[in-house]
Amino acid sequence: MTQSLKGRSVLVTGGSKGIGKGIARVFAEAGAKVAIMSRHADQAEAAAKEIGHGAFGIGGDVTSLASMESVMKAVADRNGGLDVLCANAGIFPPAKLEEMTGEQWDEVVDTNLKGTFHSVKAAIPYLKNSDQGRIVITSSITGPITGFPGWTHYGATKAGQLGFMRTACIELAKYGITVNAVLPGNIVTEGLISMGEEYGKTMAASVPLKKLGVVEDIGYAALYFASKEANYVTGQTIIVDGGQILPESLEALAQA
């Protein structure tokens, strides 16, 4: 599977840390030419240096279509085109529904949902020229499948991403571009670690595999969607959650 990614041009938005960094690492190790994008160019460059394998960092803002158009051109110019977009950029600041402000709602929607639209729209002209155009969206089990208190805005954007994906895959099929999504459960990232050790233990205990996922787990799922082995797969999702959404797991979590 990894052989089909060798030499392919890949852009990972939100790739300087967390899940995005894991995705970038997996693709780079598979021989792809990886561009890591972050709102902070220095962080993207630092992540690229750490990952190696010819990866490079670039600054960009998914909340701006003009910024994403500039990023796509820069990546295509440097890598000789664009084959894979991993639309991963996202934020998840907690806010309870009754206390949430309109500004808090808009910030998450602008980054997670509108940012996905901007990224995909800007990538289309370049993906159309690829013989293996791929779009892989990082969604979540929160929103599309289950809910999580304190993240109403986040869940809404993640459900929205799947609605976007299921229509975009139909519109872009005529160009041979596939559009799929990976739905992570609880993955060990800087954000999860910041919630405290007890939170991590509670989440791990609620998962049938009795452990949390690592960022590379999401990277391997994204790698499959981007590979030639997934040529006939579009409009689909892969849930990477260790079995967390199984009924027994949700019951255990509710009782925790």
Predicted segments, located by residue:
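Conserved glycine-rich cofactor-binding loop
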Residues: 9, 16-18
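The beta1-alpha1 cofactor-binding region of Rossmann-like NAD(H)/NADP(H)-dependent oxidoreductases
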Residues: 41, 60-71, 102, 216-217
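Short, small/polar-rich loop/turn modules that mediate ligand/substrate recognition or access, typified
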Residues: 86, 173, 178, 233-235
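Substrate-binding pocket helix/loop in short-chain dehydrogenase/reductase
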Residues: 96-97, 104-109, 192, 203
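Active-site helix of classical SDR
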Residues: 120, 157, 165
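Alpha-helical segment proximal to the catalytic Tyr-Lys
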Residues: 125, 170-171, 231
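Short C-terminal tail/terminal secondary-structure segment
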Residues: 234-256
